[in-house]
């Protein structure tokens, strides 16, 4: 499954993370 930046970011923010980014085609959440 390809990582989509907008979807990843929205998923992370909905889980109380600050933001999300695609790294090596995987979604990574960032708390800061």
Curated annotation (Swiss-Prot):
Residues recorded with modification Tyrosine amide: 32
InterPro entries, per the entry: Scorpion_toxin-like_sf
GO molecular function: potassium channel regulator activity; toxin activity
Marked site (Basic residue of the functional dyad) residue numbers: 21
Disulphide bond pairs: 3-22, 8-12, 27-29
Keywords: Amidation, Disulfide bond, Ion channel impairing toxin, Neurotoxin, Potassium channel impairing toxin, Secreted, Toxin, Voltage-gated potassium channel impairing toxin
Compartment(s): Secreted
Keyword Secreted carried by entry: yes
Marked site: Aromatic residue of the functional dyad: 30
Family from the record: Belongs to the short scorpion toxin superfamily. Potassium channel inhibitor family. Alpha-KTx 10 subfamily.
Protein name (Swiss-Prot/TrEMBL): Potassium channel toxin alpha-KTx 10.2
Organism of origin: Centruroides noxius
């Amino acid at each position: 499954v390809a990582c989509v930046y907008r979807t990843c970011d929205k998923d992370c923010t909905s889980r109380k993370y600050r933001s999300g980014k695609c790294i090596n085609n995987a979604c990574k959440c960032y708390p800061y």
